Amino acid sequence: QSYSAALMTAVSLPSFFNAIPHANGYEQISSGDTNMFRLAKEQGYETYFYSAQAENEMAILNLIGKKWIDHLIQPTQLGYGNGDNMPDEKLLPLFDKINLQQGKHFIVLHQRGSHVPYGALLQPQDKVFGEANIVDKYDNTIHKTDQMIQTVFEQLQKQPDGNWLFAYTSDHGQYVRQDTYNQGTVQPDSYLVPLVLYSPDKAVQQAANQAF
């Protein structure tokens, strides 16, 4: 468990991808000195940002580091409208097309995950907890995210050299109870988020464990 960079995507993602350690980081973000995509390119990585979030909700891309992203795909490139989100699973075929055995890759799969309205992008078979109440609907989205993580992880495990690092976290949390649900509040559920870091390379895993 870790802390999100902020309570809302518009602040959290620019802060996260620029390693902002505290509030009022706009000057650091603007400089790009600590931008993850820029740093990845400096180390010879090809960079990817594949997003399931509607294009008109991602005006923050310049702050995330758009000019250092080699491959940017949003729902509009896959036939969705400018204001349409798409199911997270649509990111998986894009990931599968990347030849992970050729070159170095810094890949971000930006999911919708557990946003309201909970379950709106799920198929009927994904609603394993039913839809009797808001908690059940929210839990369905968590289950779907778990499945997606498993799919990506299993794909990485097929790589013969074992030279990869998997990272998963969330840009913010959700406060979900039977009688109320929201985000952006000061409730701990709004800023406590999961963090998963795994590499089959023992040295990389040890470094990750020491850092986090």
For each of these PLM feature ranges, what is it?
Residues 124-128, 184-186:
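Flexible, surface-exposed loop regions and adjacent strand-edge segments
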Residues 15-18, 128-133, 201-205:
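Short glycine/proline-rich turn/loop motifs
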Residues 38, 55, 154-160, 183-186, ...:
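Membrane-interface soluble catalytic domains
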Residues 161-164, 168-204:
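Histidine-centered active-site microenvironments of extracellular/periplasmic hydrolases
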Residues 1-126:
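Active-site-proximal alpha/beta segments of enzymes that process anionic O-linked groups
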Residues 89-100, 126-166, 177:
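A long, amphipathic alpha-helix that forms part
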Residues 27-34, 132-144, 185-191, 203-212:
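A short beta-strand-to-alpha-helix junction
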Residues 49-51, 106-113, 139, 145, ...:
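Short beta-strand segments
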